[in-house]
């Protein structure tokens, strides 16, 4: 499927080049608008992107919000790749939180730019938990009792079981999304998905962000991934970086600003 998409894209590029060489105006349809793929992070599901996705669709973008299984970078990036395999043409790949780890492990020739929203952006051999190192990057409140562990059924785990982490409901609003309304926080809690503890300890592969046009939105009031850690990762990537006065859940609390950055990356 990826090969077919690549051939289609190459053929379209050739047609555009030939038309441009002939001095003929290129019609709007000949420059396909990228499809935006939004990858959610831990303690969330695709509905966390609803506000952003709605704004992008309102501007004419095709948007996909695949399910991130939250099992580990290798497994989860394969799941996202399957979603990308359904897309013809260029792709803007966006990740929030742990979703940044996942998109950093997706290598697709049709990706033209990447956007990280308060997200992990590991380099090769790193694991996400290193970005929460309390010595280098103090400030995360994602600790017990806010962070809890439970056993779950999981085909990826040993003997079909695994240990997952989740945010205790009574701490979710204060730790994860302190800048959203009570009703919004309650809806986010209802959609919370737990993550395999091993996922944040699995070494990342070669980063797809290397050599790629990248944008990074730092959540300046983040209580999950310290802002200093986010700025370090963004700087290492060479990303175009902006700060939002927002919680970790900036995609929910500030969907206009997040959507605007994605549109910039898609232009």
Regions found by a protein language model. Name each.
Residues 94-99, 103:
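Gly/Ala-rich beta-loop-alpha elbow adjacent to hydrolase catalytic centers
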Residues 110-111, 116-159, 196-199:
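Flexible "cap/lid" loop of the alpha/beta hydrolase fold
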Residues 190-237, 241-245, 249-255:
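Conserved serine/cysteine hydrolase catalytic core
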Residues 1-30:
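Secretory targeting and sorting signals
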Residues 41-44, 97-98, 120:
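Active-site glycine-rich loops that stabilize anionic/oxyanionic intermediates
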Residues 252-266:
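Post-His helix in hydrolase/transferase enzymes
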Residues 31-87:
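Active-site catalytic motif of lipid deacylating hydrolases and related acyltransferases
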